[in-house]
Amino acid sequence: MAGSMKDIKLRIKSVESTMQITKAMELVASSKMRRAKERVEHSRPYFETLHETLTKIAAADPRARNPYLRRDEIKRTLFIVIAGDRGLAGGYNSNVLKQAGAEEGEVVVLPIGKRSAEYFVHHEVPLFTQEVLLAAEISVGECFQLSRQITEGYRKGEYDAVKICYTRFDSMMTQTATTMEVLPLSIEPTEQQKAEARRSQILYKPSSEEVFSAIIPEYVAGIVYGAVCESVASELAARRTAMDAATKNAGEMIDHLNLYYNRARQAAITQEITEIVAGAEI
């Protein structure tokens, strides 16, 4: 019985130690969430403004033949996949990698996030770069550099389409693995936008097509950076939720173990009293 009580006591200490770690990770994730949410909120208007600008340019010259708008047969796709740099975030990594794994056809992958790189190296998928890009540390400048490489490869015909797979941050409790088509652009101006473009006095120099092409790298960089911001916020929210659940489970386990310990201790005391009484009667 003494051995059993000692084992229970050791297990209680082990669970308490684990609970301290999960609680600390929950607090760290919570403290980083405010900044991550601000980045998401600030990145969305940039993308929306660029998309609106491109739509206006396309509406002003609907006959323009731009390589970023063409719809040739898609034989090879560049797939940008954003996952986390660490685990302990519930189903965050597995959900986005499962979403990416559903992509059909020939692909070359640009992984962002350590877990994304490890996954595609393990599955021997052709990679756009051998450099491991950490999702939590990638900067705006690096996104612009990637954008230039991506658009250059697209113009050269190294791939016929560009897609991005990331986790959209809906709320603290909801994050959704999403695939978005980046290139070629899906821009269909409405009749109202076309009418407004005809009435507009805007002149594009040297030409609307060249201005359109010049904006594309900015647009792609905005998508990549925005998707990274959304994914980082989603990872932190998922980790906070997972660590909160783990902390609560650890607390419940400690309560149960304390109950078992008290029962074992009571049984040991009862046995000692019984033995003393039996010895006295003899």
Briefly describe each language-model feature range.
Residues 1-282:
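C-terminal beta-strand-loop-alpha-helix "lid" module of Rossmann-like NAD(P)-dependent dehydrogenases
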